[in-house]
Swiss-Prot record:
This is Mediator of RNA polymerase II transcription subunit 7. Residues 33-74 are annotated as: Disordered. Residues 44-63 have a biased composition (Basic and acidic residues). It comes from Scheffersomyces stipitis (strain ATCC 58785 / CBS 6054 / NBRC 10063 / NRRL Y-11545). The gene is MED7. GO terms for biological process: negative regulation of transcription by RNA polymerase II; positive regulation of transcription elongation by RNA polymerase II; positive regulation of transcription initiation by RNA polymerase II; RNA polymerase II preinitiation complex assembly. The keyword Protease does not apply. It is found in: Nucleus.
């Protein structure tokens, strides 16, 4: 039975809890009514507070007990955040502070001098090169030791694992920088895409303007010759000629596409 409960706690997507069935409309209405009564009682108790410290402590204890709804209603109230610096969820222990733990806090030897918060990017690069050189050297020593006395391999394996842990920890310190750079790259791609769409719209607008100018060139021709272009309602030969020219221009533009 305990094994089944352990698998249930550490499963990735556990089944819904039993108290889900208590979330009904009737219970929600009861909870609202109970909360109204609690607010009225809190206002009355604040007006009748005593100066004695012991009485205040007793009142606080009573208040904490009274703030829990009775019966099934207590399952409808969100729980208070857990106290301390860590909490348990999905079978694992998590920290409230989203911070990379140091090697010392994990009981591992730190092979570089500076702290994670004060170390600079240039120092990280230098330390990574040193750790890589040490890793290659220890690997060669392990090969030589295996050819002479294979039973003494354990110490070298521990040294190599310690170097790899330090390398992995230094690389993990780059995670915030990697997140910022990834966000910058994403924003740049979005900006480039929007600029490309804007340029495409401007290009289409310029093409439309040029085609409209071609259509209005006939107006400029008549203006240069000091000839007033008659209205479309006029049935004179000049108006008919102008209309025919416009029709030819429109047909030419349509034939291009």
């Amino acid at each position: 039975m305990s094994t089944a409960n352990g698998d249930l706690i550490s499963s990735l997507y556990p089944p819904p809890p039993v108290y889900v069935k208590f979330f009904t409309t009737e219970n929600l209405n009861k909870l609202q009514e109970w909360q109204r009564q609690q607010n009225d009682e809190e206002i009355e108790t604040k007006q009748e507070e005593a100066d004695d410290k012991d009485e205040k402590d007793n009142e606080k204890q009573n208040e904490t007990q009274d703030t829990v709804p009775p019966g099934e209603l207590r399952f409808l109230v969100p729980p208070q955040p857990p106290s301390g610096t860590h909490y348990r969820g999905y079978g694992n222990i998590w920290s409230f502070e989203d911070k990379l733990p140091s090697l010392k806090s994990a009981n591992w030897e730190q092979l570089y001098k500076d702290d994670d918060e004060s170390i600079t990017s240039e120092t990280k690069i230098k330390e990574l090169h040193k750790l890589m050189d040490s890793l290659l050297l220890n690997f060669l020593e392990l090969i030589g030791l295996a050819s002479i006395d294979p039973s003494q391999y354990e110490s070298k394996i521990k040294d190599i694992s310690l170097i790899l842990i330090n390398i992995n920890h230094l690389l993990n310190t780059y995670r915030p920088h990697q997140s910022r750079e990834s966000l910058i790259m994403l924003l740049r791609k979005q900006i480039d895409a929007k600029r490309a769409s804007i340029n495409q719209v401007e290009k289409v607008c310029s093409e439309v303007k040029q085609k409209l100018l071609k259509l209005t060139n006939i107006q400029d021709v008549y203006k240069k010759d000091s000839i007033v272009l008659p209205d479309n309602s006029d049935n004179s030969p000049m108006a008919e000629n102008a209309e025919s020219i416009k029709d030819e221009i429109i047909k030419k533009l349509l034939s291009e596409h």
